[in-house]
Amino acid sequence: MSSTPAYARPPQGYPLGTNIYFRICSKIVIPILKALTKRDWRGTEYLPQSGAVIVACNHMSYADPLVWAHYLYANGRAPRFLGKESVFRVPIIGKIISGAGQIPVHRESDRATEAVDHALNALSMGHCLGIYPEGTLTRDPDLWPMVAKTGLARLALKSRVPVIPFAQWGDQNLLPRYGKRITFWKRTKVTIVAGPPVDLSEWFEKADNHEAQVAATAKVMSAITALLAEIRGESAPAVIFDPHNSDLPRVGKFSPEKANREKRK
């Protein structure tokens, strides 16, 4: 078996980018997801069937990557996700996700930039790269997207590949934010919607400019939030939750009580 990481090799097979790790996991995970969820999938026409692409989504639950990967895999793409490095050190799980070509992120460390290089490599190979721009589960008390990090923008502006916005809603009822217990007693409706590509071309010549990265990030997050508002049938908050102005930690777990205190501010 090649020692080259799966994300650094051209994608093959169908769904594009699949390999033995994806195929084994899909045989186990997909039947479980079908038993636990009722799927409402929309916007599948916006997902390219070939070529490099960045897909970006809101983040509310540890179940998010599984249900989103199911959508992508069932519609022709085996994604390479950026995920926190600690998961890659979990016995068995770490080997599986590494073998499937997922990319570790060393958050809040001097190795964080390594993920950018690996992700650009994956895109140069023609992969579908999945990103949660917020970098962690949203801190917004009502689960709206919060102010995101600029990693997605740096990747999008340097690679100039299409960026497809996604929103998902419902799997927080399957597994609540930072929850440990899955809801088994009823099937949970999970809605995932894709939108048209976000045009970031006005910032292509400013890929290393921080203001351009912030503006590009905001445009992608606006598209994601609009899709989520459509799903929820509600208006998004006028003021976007900014974790930098919060008492909640930027990454890592926090108590529901602390989140409720934020809501009362």
PLM feature spans:
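Short Gly/charged-rich anion-binding patches and loops
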Residues: K27, R42, V67, I92, ...
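Short, basic, glycine/proline-bearing loop/turn elements
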Residues: V29, G99-H106, G135-R139
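A transmembrane-helix-recognition feature enriched in membrane-embedded lipid enzymes
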Residues: S2-G43, Q49, P91-A100
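Catalytic core of membrane glycerolipid acyltransferases/transacylases, capturing the structured
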Residues: P48-S109
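A conditional alpha-helix N-cap/helix-loop micro-motif detector
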Residues: T37, S86, S109-T113, P145-M146
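A secondary-structure boundary/capping signal
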Residues: G43, N58, G83-K84, G101, ...
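Non-catalytic C-terminal accessory region of glycerolipid acyltransferases
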Residues: S2-Y21, T113-K265
